[in-house]
């Protein structure tokens, strides 16, 4: 189960979900910078402990406006700051375990005090794996170098995975003498399954709006360029500035939508997800599953069956 910071905190929801003894728990993603590395480390340590090692710590930078204006925290430079954050977390984990004293002197985080009474002490499971959300080449390469896994952005296509994600992860991993195959690759999908064409189209339209929403971000324009659709972000932003929400979605025509969205009946979606992500993703996240549950509390079981069917035909690559 992949749980985001959105309205409610990812960590408290992960703690509640830990009561389900057979599911893995991922914060996917939690916003890093507004929380001190010590705060994040303490929460992750406890979640790893209470879940018997089923928790993975997923972190992201968010964007400048949210970090500075919503959280009142520092943002720049996000890439190096995230690298330093991960280094601080690993130093704290080692101090909790008692293998090293806390003495971390990073570019942005300096930590040197952990009295015994304030340390949670060792736990009987490994340190929580640290996964980073990454989009651009620098962040992907850095994640390949320092992280245990990568959260791919929901605005992903096979071309983006092949041309951007995998090559940069390989470059980063090679710097530290490991293979990119050692990394967990967590890929969200705008899967749009349904038992009727109306149900499928409902999720397709939701996906269309999400592609337009994410596609309005200038930093993601290159993903459309890779598809031979230059100028897509500019057209979406023009509609956005005019307050034309329907117009934003209309920029994403059906052919473009199909690059991001896998739709069909439930069985077809399983096959198509498997074909797209087999030998690439170690975990596929069904982006709309939580939304389906929020609308209809009986719907989650059907999405769970889809996930189990996908796992059966596409065993984890890692």
Predicted features and spans:
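Active-site-adjacent structural elements that line small-molecule/cofactor binding pockets in enzymes
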Residues: 4-318
């Amino acid at each position: 189960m992949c749980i985001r910071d959105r309205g409610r905190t990812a960590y408290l929801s992960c703690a509640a979900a830990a009561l389900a003894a057979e599911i893995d728990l991922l914060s996917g993603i939690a916003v890093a910078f507004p929380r001190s590395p010590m705060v994040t480390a303490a929460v992750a340590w406890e979640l790893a402990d209470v879940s018997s090692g089923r928790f993975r710590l997923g972190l992201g930078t968010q964007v400048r406006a949210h970090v500075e204006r919503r959280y009142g925290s520092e943002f720049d430079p996000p890439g190096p700051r995230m690298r330093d954050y991960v280094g601080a977390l690993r130093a704290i984990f080692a101090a909790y375990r008692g293998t090293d004293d806390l003495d971390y002197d990073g570019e942005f985080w300096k930590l040197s005090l952990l009295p015994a009474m304030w340390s949670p002490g060792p736990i009987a499971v490994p340190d929580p794996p640290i996964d980073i959300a990454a989009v651009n080449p620098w962040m992907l390469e850095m994640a390949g170098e320092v992280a245990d896994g990568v959260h791919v952005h929901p605005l992903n296509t096979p071309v983006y995975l092949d041309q951007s994600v995998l090559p940069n992860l390989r470059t980063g991993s090679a710097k530290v003498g490991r293979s990119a195959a050692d990394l967990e690759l967590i890929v969200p999908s705008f899967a749009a399954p349904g038992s009727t064409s109306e149900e499928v189209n409902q999720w397709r339209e939701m996906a269309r709006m999400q592609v337009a929403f994410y596609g309005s971000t200038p930093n993601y324009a290159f993903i459309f360029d890779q598809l031979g659709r230059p100028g897509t972000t500019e057209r979406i932003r023009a509609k956005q500035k005019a307050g034309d929400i329907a117009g934003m979605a209309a920029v994403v025509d059906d052919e473009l939508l199909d690059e991001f969205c896998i739709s069909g009946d439930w069985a077809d979606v399983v096959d198509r997800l498997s074909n797209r992500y087999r030998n690439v993703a170690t975990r596929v996240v069904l982006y709309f599953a939580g939304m389906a549950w929020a609308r209809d509390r009986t719907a989650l079981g059907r999405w769970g069956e889809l996930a189990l069917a996908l796992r059966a035909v596409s065993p984890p690559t890692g």
